[in-house]
């Protein structure tokens, strides 16, 4: 059983008789206390998708739930449901928009390396690769000699994500984006 301080984002834990998927963790160190750090976890019930915000001491023990990651590709959207297809056995996994809202800014039909996270054979979230390739839909015109400077300009990608890119990048270019930092890395 790991301590609360060892739990990471995108893990599943058993808490109060239910299985929760950890979406976000904030660490805080209270001043003037002789205790350790506090970990505020935003978790979602894997059955009801109900949100739970809970705070744990760093020494609190939690049970990890079984979690399976399956490689999949984005297939299509049906209203608020997004369908991903397993690349091995072609099983279709449906995820609600609210469960994967942040990740949708990085997903197109040709995004490779997407993992669907299953808890008790139910899809609960997706895990993205560290970098993705996306196409610039709109940005200011490129400036000749722009590669000689470090100045940047905003660029809107086909998924709706806005990132800062160097001045020599133009509309229609494919770029690599760091998913965690939401930053431009290079041309694709």
From Swiss-Prot:
One of its GO terms (biological process) is peptide biosynthetic process. One of its GO terms (cellular component) is cytoplasm. InterPro entries: Elong-fact-P_C, NA-bd_OB-fold, Rib_uL2_dom2, Transl_elong_fac_P/YeiP, Transl_elong_KOW-like, Transl_elong_p-like_YeiP, Transl_elong_P/YeiP_cen, Transl_elong_P/YeiP_CS. GO terms for molecular function: translation elongation factor activity. Transmembrane segments: none annotated. Pfam families: EFP, EFP_N, Elong-fact-P_C. Belongs to the elongation factor P family. PANTHER family: ELONGATION FACTOR P, TRANSLATION ELONGATION FACTOR KOW-LIKE DOMAIN-CONTAINING PROTEIN. This is Elongation factor P-like protein.
């Amino acid at each position: 059983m790991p301590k609360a301080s060892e739990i990471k984002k995108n893990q599943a834990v058993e808490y109060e008789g239910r299985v929760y998927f950890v979406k976000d963790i904030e660490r805080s160190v209270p001043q003037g206390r002789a205790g350790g750090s506090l970990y505020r976890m935003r978790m979602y019930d894997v059955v009801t998708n109900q949100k739970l915000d809970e705070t744990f001491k760093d020494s609190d023990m939690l049970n990890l739930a079984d979690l399976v990651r399956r490689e999949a590709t984005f297939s299509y959207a049906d209203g608020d449901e997004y369908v991903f297809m397993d690349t091995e056995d072609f099983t279709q996994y449906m995820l609600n928009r609210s469960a994967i809202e942040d990740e949708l800014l990085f997903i197109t039909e040709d995004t490779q390396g997407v993992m669907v996270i299953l808890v008790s054979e139910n899809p609960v979230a997706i895990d993205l690769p560290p970098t993705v390739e996306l196409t610039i839909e709109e940005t200011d015109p490129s400036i000749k000699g722009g590669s000689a400077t470090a100045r940047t300009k905003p660029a809107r990608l086909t998924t709706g994500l806005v990132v800062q890119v160097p001045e020599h990048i133009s509309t229609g270019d494919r770029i690599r984006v760091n998913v965690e930092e939401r930053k431009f890395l290079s041309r694709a």
